Amino acid sequence: MKKRSSRAIALLLAVVMVLALAACGEEPAVDPAESGEPEPSGETPAASGSGLVIALPGEPQSLDPYAHSMYYNFMAATLIFDTLVTKDADGNYVPELATEWEFTDDLTLHVVLRDDVYFHDGSQLTADDVKFTLDTAAASSFSSSIFAWYDPDNTTVIDPQTIDIKLKYAYAATLEVLASIRSAIVNKAAYEADPASYTRTPIGTGPMKVENWYSGDRIEFVKNEDYWGEPVAFDTCTFRIIVEASTRTIELETGGVDIAVDLAYSDWSRIEENPELVLVSGRTDNMASLVFNNSIEPFNNILVRQALAHALDLESLVQVCWEGTAEVAEGYYASSMLGFKAEGPREYNVELAKELLAEAGYPDGFSFTYTTYQTNLNQTFAQVVQSMWAEIGVEAKIEIVDLATFTDMNNNGQLTTALLTPSVAISDPSAALILWPITRTISLRHNDQHIQDLLDAGSSTYDEAERVEIYQELQDYLYEMTYTVPVAYPTFAFGAAADVQGFNFASNQIPDLTTVSVG
């Protein structure tokens, strides 16, 4: 028989009170005189019909697409750069910088480029720029994981408009990677001449270019009048750096910005109820999972794992921890991706959980240390699962460490259990299942060769129907083995003025700004 966890609901009230009293620290301001950059001149631009103004939650570390992994940095990249291919509204790959592409064999992608594309500095795009971009991406610690398939040594520039991209192994998601803004094509000559400058004033082929960057305040873009493709509908774009979420919302309400990024959960309903604003929200590609360390007792016992899973009232857990802004996970990756299969959620059943524990040899339960790091979400999650597991006699002793310690413990397999929400780089199961390769040293440690065999088959099979069958078999097996518990699909929200058109939610949290118009 199902029942709601009264302890979990009570915890919600306690947590809300604690958070209401929490103080927020302020980030130190950057002195433009010390940074060697121009001081802001005049007032910060207000939202207007000829310009687009966007409030960011932080300052980009870099505009070099291979020197960061932050989603709002990539939002700028959609204006500055182009990719070889892109995807249309139906999910089909269509030309962008490339006019033609073909797999001539499993390890060779033959690509022909447009001959009318020029960078912001007036130089023409060539296949040398493409090879340099892919070489850079594969070597960067920020992007190497999604370019592991790329073979720089055997990739060949045929002529200025033609390149044979070589793969180290067959990889079905190659075009998905190349269509991502994480594959933005950079200017080889400019990048090599001054890598430091490229982080702040990158040279791309996109519809806008960087004009000014005032540290701690704003980044200004102007239209590229010589753009080869469809021009954007605004002459200027300004990224305003507004760290406080409440201030971003106020700026949106008062017309100071057209779009606000990463709204506070508490402001979502406020935006929805305002007829002059629109909440643009949806599920992200990411998923939060409760991971068991399957290499240590008692978590190496499938009956224990199943017992702990059945003891979780996921509906209450997600409601409490994500404050109503996430959905209970039904499977092992986002439902929008190829081959998704709804496997759960697993039934909440305390009596069954107790029976499974007894069958596993733990009729009186057991105790263990649950280690997490200090964020509101992590601490609340730890407290709620602690309460739920206590109902079946399992004592989870909560240990709070700093992020660096947590990361080190996870990477060395020292956590007993953990809430992990890995960032998914591309919308493909080969990337979404990032926790599962057997070679990873994180605390999941399933050491199950069958999983690795299915992962390899799914990522290397080019036939889409076969890929679906493989990934669905894998999801069935993951559900059966209960190495993890899929918990939540987090949602994400932007706010926009009602007169902003063409601003569409993207599950990777990187909306395409080139489609936006104002007024």
PLM regions with names:
Residues 356, 494-519:
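Long beta-strand-rich cores associated with HINT superfamily self-processing modules
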Residues 55-104, 135, 203:
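N-terminal lobe/hinge region of extracytoplasmic solute-binding protein
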Residues 225-270, 395:
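Ligand-site clamp/hinge motif
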Residues 102, 147-190, 212:
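Surface-exposed binding/hinge segments that line
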Residues 126-133, 160-164, 206-207, 234-236, ...:
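Alpha-helical secondary-structure segments
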Residues 88-92, 179-232, 236, 351, ...:
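Gly/Pro-rich hinge or "lid" segments in bacterial periplasmic/extracellular proteins
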Residues 110, 395-406, 431-498, 519:
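Extracytoplasmic/peripheral linker and loop segments enriched in polar/acidic and small residues
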Residues 8, 323, 327-359, 377-379:
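Structural transition elements
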